[in-house]
Amino acid sequence: MKFTHCLASVALVSVLGACGGVQNQVTDVKGPVDYVNPYMGNISHLLVPTFPTIHLPNSMLRVYPERADYTTDMLNGLPLIVTSHRGSSAFNLSPYQGDKLRPVIAYSYDNEILKPYYYEVILDDEEIKVKYAPSHQSALYQIEYSQQDKPVYMMINSRNGAIKAGDGVVSGYQQLENNTRVYLYIESDVAPIETGILADGKIDVDKKEAEGRNACAVMHFADGTKTVNLRYGISFISEEQAKKNLQRELPDYNLRALAEKGRQIWDKALSDIQVEGGSETDKQVLYTSLYRVFERPVCISEDGRYFSAFDGKIHEDNGEPFYTDDWIWDTYRAAHPLRLLIDEGTEKNVIDSYLRMAEQMGDMWMPTFPEITGDSRRMNSNHAVATVADAAAK
């Protein structure tokens, strides 16, 4: 198989079709993103497996199904944001029909479709169909209910933090480690008939705010509601910034257009490496591996500012995006040298972020495992130094 580095983006061919709303049509032309198999590596025999992550390249908002690995037959609610690569996520979304409300609903599931830019699944016991597409700091869910004789609910669980229920709006935060918070602002295109806080398995409409473990807001929609679209923004700065991120990125509830835009972004990013010859399997392995390179680090600059857990402060980025959640022990050998060849600008910003981390921690030591919640100082040696040395040599 012959490799070619192509700095110019290739022509993009949309394969988003009418079948299922956003699934790929059969086409004679496949883009690099069509070879990506996010399920590859999802079963681990020793360490942590890979996860089928839905996100845009190096973007702050990442999700994957709430399950242990590919063999797990249940989902613990629906995801809203991953806050640590292969580590943890924040918040839970639980659409539900019935009278046994809980902060997180465990779902059996089937007919899952998962692309880097799109997710679809049937929650079969609940008879609910879910579609999802992300942007950089916001995302969109489409929830289709089908049981006509049961009430229609949506639960938003903060897990460990605070939540507020308004008229078609829910906002709040989840407390992470090292004085770090992730904030949420979520809107519905369907006005609920009532909102409140989950208490003892029921919706308390007289209560609009809650704090602590499993603080959970509830939206109750009119009987017979078939489809609810939810759009949300996330932030590590504030609830207000989460709202701004949503408004900047998602002007409407058009999931099809959002998924198509995500596909084009992925195809352009992966097209920096072109191949000739080889088998379909070879191309799957190559482009899936390249897709993994874009999982981390993530850019957490929001409108020119970012929260740094390395000193617990909000900083201006002065036009240079701030990246973290890298786990350098995993990435210094291949991911960083490759990124320098195919995306020199991003690699420069990543290395600049390391230097800012060292300054913010006050000891001028380069980070070893930079995460959203700061540097966890794992693994021996300091591989950021090797990363900088390699970049300087190139």
Model-derived segments and spans:
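Bacterial N-terminal signal peptides that target proteins for export
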Residues: 1-8
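Repetitive helical segments and hydrophobic/amphipathic motifs
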Residues: 11-14
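C-terminal motif of bacterial Sec signal peptides marking the signal peptidase cleavage site
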Residues: 17-18
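Accessory carbohydrate-recognition regions in carbohydrate-active enzymes
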Residues: 24-394
